[in-house]
Structure formats: C-alpha cells, structure tokens
C-alpha cells in the first residue's frame, strides 16, 4: 500500500485539502495538535450552553465553498440540507461613524448607488460606483495570482497586471483619500484593519473585498426550519460539514497529536515525526503557522529563501472577540453593525437569535494581538511576494492557509487549499 498523504493542521485549509485529496483517491491522514477540528472556526460552548464560534457570521464569496464540496462529494446545498441548514442571503451591513451618522449599505450595485445618492448625493455615489468598478479589474488580475493559480514571484506581474493592481494609488490610505469623503474613506481604511494590517501599509488592491461583497453578495448559514433559528449565522456549521466529509472519505484524523518535524531524504519528504514516533508520508500539506513550518518542522537547511523572506514578515493583528447575551433580533437573521472611527478602525457586532433572546459576537479591532492564525500583516506591496508559495522549495511539501498569497479570508484560505491539493496530486502522479 502506498504511503499516505499527511495533512498537518485541522483548520479550514487542512480540512479542505484533506477532503479534495481523499476524493482524488489518496489515502489521507490529518494531524491536529488540539482536541477539535476547525482552528479559529471551531465551535465551542459558552457557560450558558450556547454553541458559538469566533468566525464571521457573514460569509462572502461562496463559490470556493461550493467548489470544495462539489469536488469532494455531495454539493454544498445538499450537504447542508442533509444537516438541516441552508446558505441564505444575508441582510445589509449597518455602519455607524464617529460623528454618529449611520449608513445601511446593501450589497448590490444598484442598491448601493441609490442609498449613497440619498445619503451623500449623486457625485459621491458615482465616485464610489466607479471605484468599485475599477476594483473589479484588479479582482480579475488577482484571480491568476494566488487565487486560482499559484503566485511564485514578481515575474508573474506583467505591465498590465501592475497597472490594474496599483494604478496611481499605492496604498489603501491613499485610496481612501481619493474618494474625498470622510465616511466612505473610513470604510475603505477599515478593510486594512479587518485584514489585521494598517491602511498605510496595505496595498490599494486589497480593497477588492468591497468589490467581491458587491458582486457575490453576503451569506449566512441558517436552519431550513426558520422556527428553529438558534444556529442562524453560526458559520462553524461549515466546519462540521467538512468534518463529516472527511469521515465519509475515510480520512484518518488524529486529534491531540502534534507533529514535531518533517523528515526529508534524498531531497524529498518521506515521513513526519510525532510524539508516538515516525509516520511515513508520500507528501505533506502543511497548514499551520508558517514560521513553525519553516523554522521548526522542516530541517534547518530546507527552503532557505522562504526562511529569509519570513524573517521580514510578522503575523497579522487579530481582534479581541467576545460573546454576550443581547435582546433578540426582530428577524431570524444576522444583523451586522460596524462602528468605524474616523481613522477607519472598526468594531464589528454580529447579533443573531439565541435561546431566550439574542447573542452578540463582537470583533474589536481597537484591541488586537499578533496571531499567525489570522494571516500575515501587510508591509507594503513587496510583503505579498514574500508570502510562502503553495508549492514550497521542498519536493512533496505544500503550504496552504491564511498566510498564503491568496489572502486570509475564509474563501481565500479554501482556494489556497485547493491549489495545494492540485499540486500535491500532480506531484504524486509524477513520482509513481
């Protein structure tokens, strides 16, 4: 029997890569050092017994999720229906600015134009619409640079790509200034903070998040039976669906089992080492902290260029997350309210139904801690090219997660896992 493919890490990237590789016919073993799957999306219970998670309650860009489930078995809609859930369109986003003004912004293009025209006038609405249309060009370029194909180095950035990504405004801070409106400028700056970075150090093209939200909508997980609304907005249901998919595909999951090292022989991966001894590995997909991957798991002489690049990077800033009881929302849906300072620092509140009332989850970007699970902080455009590539310098070792060039959002993490699975599958076919 062939040696298994080993996946290190049971977060979103690890679950997604394992599901794809198992469906492709490989024997897969997943190792997770904690006692639960899901990473930062893992569900857990409060003292009150309510099941919560630290994931965003609103999901954007669902296509990667749908592709993942379709390519590993039953489609997403069918899998959720089997569990009693559905992925449904979410309501608009409400923003409260430093001066007390409020803006409820729908996701669709026409709705945004109408709301902004009514609130700020036609010229402001047109500037916003034109900006997001231009970001659509950047989005098309980014698809081939880490999202749907691997990004290796600067040679992939031809003149047309650089023009669509950068234009005249290099940072999100400059882009925010160009909109010439206090409120909308703060909205643009908030994109950087929600990515764990600063607007002055974040490339302007990171604002594509505004375009994808307008183009692909906002979504929430909710029960099929609306009277049973306790899990509305609990995004970790997707983790539970992925865990079920791994069981269906007979992926061996080892919880409470940390991997201490990856063994290389004759220039390629051959095994991993755990507390219980060595385990053979035909290939390894690593989805944990990138500094741990290259400084601890791999031998000291492996991937020297990536090691040097990582020394110039730092983890992203993760928000403080709290959960507290609140008044029940008027409808069985998630209500997202973002309080944004003049500088663009957001505090995100997700209010959703809970037993005997409501539950409010708060992501406070005024209080942050460095966290590799949240991705890599921007430090100018060049930092993007320093992110570890999906295909590492070590044959048979692949890296996927929020640190990948694709980006830290859930859909981007799922896409990086797809690239890792495809490259790993091709590698295994080439060596057999």
Please report, for each region that a protein language model flagged, where it lies by residue.
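Glycine-rich phosphate/pyrophosphate-binding beta-alpha loops
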Residues: 56-61, 193, 319, 402-413
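Conserved flavin/dinucleotide-binding core of flavoenzymes
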Residues: 342-432
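Active-site-adjacent "gating/activation" loops or surface patches in catalytic cores
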Residues: 187-225, 392-395
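N-terminal glycine-rich phosphate/pyrophosphate-binding loop and immediately adjacent elements
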Residues: 3-140
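Rossmann-like flavin
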Residues: 99-103, 107-204
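Helical element adjacent to the flavin cofactor pocket in flavoenzyme catalytic cores
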Residues: 210-269, 273
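General small-molecule cofactor/ligand-binding pocket signal
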Residues: 86, 252-256, 398
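Mid-domain catalytic core of redox enzymes
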Residues: 231, 260-357
């Amino acid at each position: 029997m062939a040696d298994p493919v080993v996946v290190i890490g049971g977060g979103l990237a690890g679950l997604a890569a394992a599901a794809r590789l198992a469906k492709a016919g490989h024997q897969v073993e997943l190792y997770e050092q904690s006692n639960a799957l899901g990473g930062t999306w893992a569900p857990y219970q409060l003292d009150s017994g309510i099941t919560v998670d630290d994931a965003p309650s609103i999901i954007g860009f669902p296509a990667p999720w749908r592709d993942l489930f379709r390519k590993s078995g039953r489609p997403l809609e069918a899998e959720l229906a089997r569990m009693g859930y559905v992925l449904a369109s979410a309501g608009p986003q409400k923003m409260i600015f430093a001066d007390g003004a409020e803006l409820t912004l729908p996701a669709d293009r026409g709705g945004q134009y109408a709301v902004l025209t009514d609130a700020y006038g036609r010229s402001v609405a047109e500037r916003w619409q034109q900006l997001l249309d231009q970001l659509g060009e950047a989005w098309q370029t980014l698809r081939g640079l880490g999202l749907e194909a691997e990004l290796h180095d600067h040679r992939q950035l031809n003149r047309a790509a650089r023009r669509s990504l950068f234009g005249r405004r290099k940072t999100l801070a400059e882009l925010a200034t160009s909109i010439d409106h206090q409120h909308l400028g703060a909205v643009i700056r908030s994109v950087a903070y929600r990515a764990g970075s600063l607007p002055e150090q974040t490339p302007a093209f990171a604002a594509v998040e505004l375009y994808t939200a307008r183009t692909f909508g906002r979504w929430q997980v909710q029960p099929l039976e609306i009277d049973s609304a306790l899990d509305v907005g609990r995004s970790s249901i997707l983790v539970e669906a992925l865990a079920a998919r791994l069981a269906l595909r007979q992926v061996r999951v080892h919880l409470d089992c940390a991997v201490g090292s990856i063994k290389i022989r004759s220039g390629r991966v051959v095994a991993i080492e755990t507390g219980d001894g060595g385990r053979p590995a035909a290939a390894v997909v690593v989805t944990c902290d990138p500094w741990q991957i290259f400084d601890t798991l791999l031998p000291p002489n492996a991937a020297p260029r990536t090691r040097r690049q990582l020394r110039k990077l730092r983890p992203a800033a993760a928000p403080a997350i709290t959960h507290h009881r609140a008044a029940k929302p008027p409808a069985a849906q998630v209500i997202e309210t973002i309080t944004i300072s003049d500088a663009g620092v957001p505090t995100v509140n997700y209010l959703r139904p809970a037993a005997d009332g409501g539950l409010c989850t708060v992501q406070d970007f005024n209080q942050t801690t460095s966290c590799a699970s949240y991705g890599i902080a921007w430090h100018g455009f060049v930092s993007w090219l320093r992110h570890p590539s999906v295909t590492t310098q070590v044959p048979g070792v692949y890296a996927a997660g929020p640190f990948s060039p694709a980006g830290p959002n859930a859909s981007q993490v799922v896409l990086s896992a797809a690239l890792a699975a495809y490259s790993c599958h091709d590698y295994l076919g080439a060596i057999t």
